[in-house]
């Protein structure tokens, strides 16, 4: 089967070179197609009555409650616009606690009294939907018989048109809550967390005399992914069902030559990227960057910053679009954190900042950061946020897939710390010692080549090993996993920041109330903030063992796996803070904890069952046949009087590995029959018993692969999947 897939993949690539490039989608002008399939501000302004438009804009930009009286007007305009573009259906698109999106399509068609059909879509259908809430994860908040749930239109995220091969659907972003009002999704707490942060940030901005009225978080996620030939994908049951390879010996060449990163993009892959970008531009997703990543067949796409809620929707749309477009080019798109052992896995760097409604980035240091006290206040508050809530941030990116990646010299360590860089670290050290007098200047970089321009050099280097790094005018949360929604990492950051800003605002308000100037109040507060939280600052090599030891001395958490990380979400301090800022209540937090535990256990169990199946039905039968062939060859050579010394060694090695594979497969199968117990106990058993048994079984399978003749090995190999493009 492996050799058949190789033949088909090779033929497909050759055929692509002959005909595929000619039939690839023509490139459209981004400026002409951008947002053409979205019900955006421009469309709303043209199609809505003036009063309705202004009312809707107040809801979107100022978070004012939606006026129910405009719902029918907006719905009619939206329906007419969608039908003009060929839409026949609409859907309330939401993000339940599955980690992916959900949708149910309803037709615009309704029967008329004359026996004909008319298109209907009113305010009621726009504002509220009613999916079955019992069929989605609820963490015990809903029983099977408690099925009622509601979707509620989110006017801050523009609706768009999903164009399929045989029809078009109007997609309306919505929140998802239970009949009792509890959040069953990721959008609802994200919106709540943005409001919580805005409230606390505005307290500080008002002290500085700002005219702003709102603050929002902005973000831009860098999505890493793999592309492999679709023939290889369908020949690997582990990729189909688990998203990653559960067996696979390392190829002679991996990423050792460092020749993949920023390298030439293969023609077929580039055609795929062009098509994806075209589709995303049409629905208003501002993708900006594309390039090869470190591992072979690994790539990255990154957008321009947007408001966090819209960016989260757009990120899910990006992943869905990439999966949908890949088959057109004979490719499979893999978002798993570690689809291939021995080469880098994939992450999703979450670039995060705060901006007011006047367009000011609150994390922009300006030309003289040591004099920009408003920036220093917000930056120091982030020290407090990350130091105090490091466990929450670690939990927000925990998953079975990310366990394969974090701390493996390819991704940030599981220890949460902040990289500030030389310039900011120097300023904070000056402040702690009595006051900042200057800002480090990077100077000019002279390449020594007369025809090349002299370059302004940044005051500090970058640190790719840091999980949370300041990168000029934003923080980059680098530990986020490639396959997860960015919603909960955003929620965790927003709540942590809101709590820290609350503390800072309270201190500054008290000082100003006692007749101190804001400058004096800041001067007194900053040294204490820095001193109390400087342990979280680390500018060194996060991969080094020395850092783990140093982090332990500093008292930082080192939660190395998902099972250790998940309880952070139900710690009393976390519950109290989430409830204080009205983001999630105790019941909602415990539900997410239960769902995360169940997801971890189910994910690993699916992988383990697949490993046993593949060992018994794919590897073992062919290994036994090869063992028989070698045994017959040894007997024939011996009978002819030839030397069988080395052949006998090969036979013994194969026989030993076959026995080992069978024993280890049985051991893993027995581990899967373990009585569940509580969710916590089951998760710990899976981590401590099932995962090591999987590792042991894989070792035997991979060793057998290295001995088997290529034409008889049943699975596409790493060499084929990663390098045949």
Show which residues each predicted segment covers:
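A charged N-terminal "starter" segment
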Residues: 2-53
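Gly-rich Lys/Arg/Thr-decorated short loops/hinges at beta-loop-alpha junctions or inter-strand turns
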Residues: 29-40, 59-61, 181, 252-261
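Active-site core of metal-dependent hydrolases
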Residues: 32-148
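Hydrophobic/aromatic-rich, well-ordered segments within soluble, folded domains that form packed cores
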Residues: 87, 91-93, 312-328, 354-355, ...
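Short linear, low-complexity motifs centered on an aromatic residue
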Residues: 99-114, 131-134, 139, 236, ...
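Short, intrinsically disordered, low-complexity segments enriched in Ser/Thr and Pro
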Residues: 110-145, 258, 382, 505-514, ...
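Glycine-rich, acidic/polar active-site loops that bind/position phosphate-bearing ligands
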Residues: 148-335, 344-594
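C-terminal amphipathic alpha-helical interaction region
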Residues: 522, 526-725
């Amino acid at each position: 089967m492996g050799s058949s897939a190789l033949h088909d993949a090779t033929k497909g690539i050759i055929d692509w070179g002959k005909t595929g490039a000619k039939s690839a989608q023509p490139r459209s002008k981004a400026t002409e197609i951008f947002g053409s399939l979205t019900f955006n501000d421009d469309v709303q302004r043209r199609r809505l009555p003036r009063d309705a438009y202004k009312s809707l804009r107040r809801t979107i930009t100022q978070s004012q409650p939606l006026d129910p009286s405009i719902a029918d007007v907006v719905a009619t305009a939206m329906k007419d616009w969608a039908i003009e573009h060929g839409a026949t259906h609409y859907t309330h698109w939401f993000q339940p606690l599955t980690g992916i999106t959900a949708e149910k399509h309803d037709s615009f068609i309704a029967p008329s009294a004359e026996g004909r059909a008319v298109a209907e879509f009113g305010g009621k259908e726009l504002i509220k939907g009613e999916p079955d809430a019992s069929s989605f994860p609820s963490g015990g908040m809903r029983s099977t018989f408690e099925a009622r749930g509601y979707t509620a239109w989110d006017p801050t995220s523009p609706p768009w048109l999903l164009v399929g091969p045989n029809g078009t659907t109007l997609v309306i972003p919505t929140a998802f809550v239970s009949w009792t009002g509890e959040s069953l999704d990721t959008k609802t707490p994200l919106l709540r967390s943005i409001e919580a942060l805005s409230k606390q940030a505005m307290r500080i901005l008002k002290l500085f005399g700002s005219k702003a009225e709102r603050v929002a978080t902005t973000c831009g996620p860098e999505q890493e992914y793999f592309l492999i030939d679709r023939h290889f994908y369908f020949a690997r049951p582990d990729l189909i069902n688990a998203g990653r390879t559960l067996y696979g010996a390392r190829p002679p060449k991996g990423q050792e030559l460092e020749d993949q990163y920023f390298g030439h993009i293969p023609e077929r892959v580039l055609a795929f990227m062009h098509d994806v970008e075209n589709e995303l531009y049409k629905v208003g997703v501002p993708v900006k960057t594309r390039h090869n990543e470190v591992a072979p067949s690994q790539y990255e796409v990154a957008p321009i910053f947007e408001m966090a809620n819209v960016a989260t929707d757009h990120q899910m749309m990006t992943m869905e679009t990439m999966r949908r477009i890949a088959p057109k080019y004979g490719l499979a798109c893999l978002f798993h954190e570690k689809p291939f052992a021995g080469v880098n896995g994939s992450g999703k760097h979450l670039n995060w900042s705060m901006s007011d409604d006047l367009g000011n980035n609150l994390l922009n240091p300006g030309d003289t950061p040591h004099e920009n006290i408003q920036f220093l206040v917000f930056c120091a508050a982030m020290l407090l946020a990350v130091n105090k809530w490091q466990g929450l941030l670690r939990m927000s990116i925990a998953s079975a897939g990310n366990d394969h990646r974090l701390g493996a010299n390819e991704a940030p360590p599981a220890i949460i710390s902040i990289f500030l860089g030389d310039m900011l670290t120097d300023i904070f050290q000056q402040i702690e010692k009595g006051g900042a007098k200057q800002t480090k200047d990077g100077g000019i970089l002279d390449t020594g080549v007369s025809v090349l321009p002299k370059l302004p050099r940044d005051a500090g280097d970058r640190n790719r090993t840091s999980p949370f790094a300041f990168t000029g005018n934003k923080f980059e949360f680098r530990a986020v996993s490639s396959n997860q929604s960015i919603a909960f990492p955003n929620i965790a950051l927003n709540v942590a920041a809101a709590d820290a800003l609350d503390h800072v605002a309270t201190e500054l308000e008290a000082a100003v109330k006692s007749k101190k100037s804001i400058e004096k109040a800041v001067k007194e507060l900053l040294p204490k903030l820095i001193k109390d939280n400087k342990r979280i600052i680390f500018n060194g090599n996060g991969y080094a063992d020395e850092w783990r030891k140093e982090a332990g001395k500093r008292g930082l958490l080192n939660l190395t796996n998902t099972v250790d990380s998940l309880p952070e979400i139900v710690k009393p301090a976390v519950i109290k803070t989430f409830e204080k800022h009205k983001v999630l209540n105790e019941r909602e937090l415990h539900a997410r904890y239960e769902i995360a535990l169940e997801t971890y256990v189910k994910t690993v169990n699916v992988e383990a069952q697949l490993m046993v199946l593949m060992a018994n039905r794919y590897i073992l039968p062919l290994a036994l046949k090869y063992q028989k062939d070698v045994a017959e060859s040894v007997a024939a050579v011996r009978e002819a009087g030839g030397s069988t010394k080395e052949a006998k060694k090969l036979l013994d090695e194969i026989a030993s590995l076959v026995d080992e594979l069978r024993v280890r497969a049985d051991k893993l199968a027995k581990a899967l029959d373990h009585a569940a117990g509580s969710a916590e106990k089951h998760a710990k058993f899976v981590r401590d018993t099932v995962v090591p048994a999987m590792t042991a079984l894989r070792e035997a399978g991979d060793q057998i692969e290295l001995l088997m003749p290529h034409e008889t090995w049943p699975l596409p190999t790493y060499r084929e999947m990663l390098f045949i493009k």
